[in-house]
A protein has these predicted regions:
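Extracytoplasmic loop-helix module adjacent to an early transmembrane segment
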Residues: 8, 17-73, 81-86
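Loop-to-helix entry region of an early transmembrane alpha helix in multi-pass inner-membrane enzymes
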Residues: 66-82, 87-106
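Membrane-interface transmembrane helices that cradle and orient dolichyl/undecaprenyl
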Residues: 119, 156-173
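Start-transfer (signal-anchor) and selected internal transmembrane alpha helices
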Residues: 1-21, 215-223
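Transmembrane-helix signature of polytopic, membrane-embedded enzymes
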Residues: 94, 108-134
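Membrane-interface alpha helices of multi-pass inner-membrane proteins
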Residues: 173-188, 198-199, 220-225
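Membrane-proximal stem/loop segments at transmembrane-domain junctions that anchor or position
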Residues: 47-63, 237-294
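Short acidic/glycine- and proline-prone juxtamembrane loop motifs at membrane-interface regions
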Residues: 140-151
Length: 294
């Protein structure tokens, strides 16, 4: 009975995750702490962290600029966190850790269902469920209050609905697909990679199956995902009565990635942020210097 196995996988992952987060009692740090501070304060009507010169975690790295002048895309997860803190209170990140646990369990369930969609064989899904039950790394990651897990979960289920559309041509399943992808990109902006993948698949489907509505959905996805992120940024800027810059760009990250890191090969270094802030958050000047370095 695969439905029983799927339910068992969800319950097992959720129980292990809940035991873990309540045993460890982790607290946020680094970017996670900045987002916690901002979300918990905005939930109480305080928008000071969005202004330059504000007192926030590791503020010395930002040369007096607001964290969100450098990384405005983080406001997507700030919005999600703020909603949670308005409902459950601002004293702890534990509500978001619980949501992380449920999202890991839901993501595992989504992977199992996608396996069934693609292969159509209970035996293969059974093997995948057993493998997922033994994969505890994402469960241990639930103490990290960031957008990774929520974004991953939403992207996996968006993939499930997109595959369902390809297999059934039922247009209504594109609605949850689009909504979940928007939430995924808000939680973790890196999940734009899913948008790219979805658009490519929809274009191929358009050409192969002559389903021209697929290309319309691809266009709608791009507008919804990118537009919602920009709308959230503008909303917070308006609420805080301030102006937020465009932030560190992909060109600066490319320059950063080509340089050595003080942490580990291929890992983070301060070059992208330093270029941006040293040019007074002028992205054109910063990118010009980055291209010269590249």
């Amino acid at each position: 009975n695969m439905k029983f196995m799927e339910a068992g996988l969800f319950a097992f992952s959720a129980i292990i995750g809940l035991v873990w987060i309540f045993s460890v009692q982790s607290i946020p740090a680094a970017d996670s702490y900045n987002i916690y501070e901002t979300a918990s304060q905005t939930a109480q009507g305080n928008y000071a962290f969005l202004h330059n010169g504000s007192d926030f975690y590791n503020k010395d790295f930002y040369s007096g600029f607001s964290y969100y002048n450098c990384y405005p895309f983080q406001l997507g997860f700030v919005l999600i966190s703020e909603i949670v803190y308005r409902i459950f209170g601002t004293d702890s990140t534990m509500p978001l850790q619980v949501i992380n646990v449920l999202c890991v369990a839901a993501a595992y369930l989504g992977i199992a269902k996608i396996t069934k969609q693609i292969f159509g064989r209970n035996k293969i899904e059974f093997i995948v469920i057993l493998a997922l039950a033994g994969c505890i790394q994402p469960v241990l990651f639930c103490t990290f209050v960031y957008g990774n897990i929520i974004g991953m979960c939403c992207a996996i289920w968006a993939s499930h609905f997109l595959i369902k559309y390809f297999q059934t041509d039922k247009y209504l399943v594109l609605i949850p697909c689009g909504v979940l992808l928007v939430v995924s990109a808000l939680a973790k902006y890196n999940n734009l990679i899913y948008l790219v993948a979805f658009v490519i698949m929809l274009i191929i489907h358009t050409v192969k199956a002559k389903k021209w509505q697929s290309i319309a959905f691809a266009l709608a996805l791009c507008i919804a995902v990118v537009g919602t992120s920009n709308l959230v940024i503008k909303s917070y800027a308006s609420r805080a009565n301030t102006e937020l810059k465009g932030g560190v760009s992909q060109v600066l990250y490319l320059d950063m990635g080509l340089n050595e890191s003080y942490m580990a090969p291929g890992w983070y270094n301060n070059i992208a942020l330093s270029l941006y802030t040293s040019n007074n958050c002028d992205i054109d000047a910063a990118e010009s210097q980055a291209w010269s370095d590249i």
